Curated annotation (Swiss-Prot):
A molecular function GO annotation: tRNA binding
Record keywords, A-Z: 4Fe-4S, Cytoplasm, Disulfide bond, Iron, Iron-sulfur, Metal-binding, Methyltransferase, rRNA processing, S-adenosyl-L-methionine, Transferase, tRNA processing
Listed Gene3D superfamilies: 1.10.150.530, Aldolase class I
Co-factor binding details: Binds 1 [4Fe-4S] cluster. The cluster is coordinated with 3 cysteines and an exchangeable S-adenosyl-L-methionine.
UniProt protein name: Dual-specificity RNA methyltransferase RlmN
PANTHER family tied to this protein: 23S RRNA METHYLTRANSFERASE, RADICAL SAM CORE DOMAIN-CONTAINING PROTEIN
Organism for this UniProt entry: Xanthomonas campestris pv. campestris (strain B100)
Transferase in keyword set: yes
Gene for this chain: rlmN
Cofactor dependency: [4Fe-4S] cluster
Positions of disulphide bridges: 127-370
EC number: 2.1.1.192
CDD domains, alphabetized: Radical_SAM
Record's GO cellular component terms: cytoplasm
Family: Belongs to the radical SAM superfamily. RlmN family.
Amino acid sequence: MNEVAIPSVLLDVPVPAATVHKQNLLDLDREGLEHFFADTLGEARYRAHQMMKWIHHRYVTDFDQMTDLGKALRAKLHQHAEVLVPNVVFDKPSTDGTHKWLLAMGTDGKNAIETVYIPDKGRGTLCVSSQVGCGLNCTFCSTATQGFNRNLTTAEIIGQVWVAARHLGNVPHQQRRLTNVVMMGMGEPLMNFDNVVRAMSVMRDDLGYGLASKRVTLSTSGLVPMIDRLATESDVSLAVSLHAANDALRESLVPLNKKYPIAELMESCARYLRGNKKRDSVTFEYTLMKGINDQPEHARQLARLMRQFDNAVQSKDAGKVNLIPFNPFPGTRYERSGETEIRAFQKILLDAQVLTMVRRTRGDDIDAACGQLKGQVMDRTRRQAEFRRTLEGQADRDAAA
């Protein structure tokens, strides 16, 4: 057998060490963490519970500060794991107490999302994003104008809650300033199903943020098959972006309606309620736009649809309506309905025994109101450039320090 001579120059080339993939623990719910500690680290599952408390109750991400974990375990964690939370590019308070954060997603300087905290009497609600951008092209939503970039990871979704809760000084089960989470930020949550459901599991876990299922709300534009899947995998509250009670008008506002028309959507919502006795209602969101969907006939159509829904579920107030005055953004052709039209619309619904609320506009002075989330600058290219400049400025400040 002939031997092959190896050039001496190759013998001097160092062989790179194998890169050990580190698991971001923020990507895991309780079950995932238990498996990671048992299977990867060879540790007892209760260690996962300690880790969840450090991350989500005490907001600690440095393993060396986790004092009830032994030195050997901390060494294994340093080798195999990390806790990466979103980087806060900037945060903006509103005059009404609303707070908006622009958060960096990833390390490439290309993706940033917004999350908003809305305080109210006796409650504090966090509006969480599920995607960078959105691909559903609803014509009245600012997020749609930037297009779809990618889904957020579980860590990036629950990381929004982590950032807000830490900023607020939230202490689960004690000093609770964050009482509700709504998946109503950027993106369509049901198009990022697995990551969203996993993140909502952490929100509701006593070792996470301890929120009751009814205090976590997922809002969808109407992906019928995924509503059915959600009914089997979660028991959170459901909200539907309806905005019109007839197919022709809804198709012009929510293009997804061409694939899943109103009749199919309403039946899937009825199945969602019938599948779990803990779920007693669906909230239907209706953005009021001047001269588009705010006329008395539109209100009467919506009232009929809600009565039909109650009958299908065989429960009074199974369908609740949340009227949302349109929040303008640069470049939109729509206008907000006047106060007179809004009250007249609500009165028709109330007279028809439909439980109806008007959402008070919050955070519009910082572009944090419903439908306004998209980033600080108008288009994706400019948004990314602004984001990179912000990070470079921070790096320069760190270097000078």
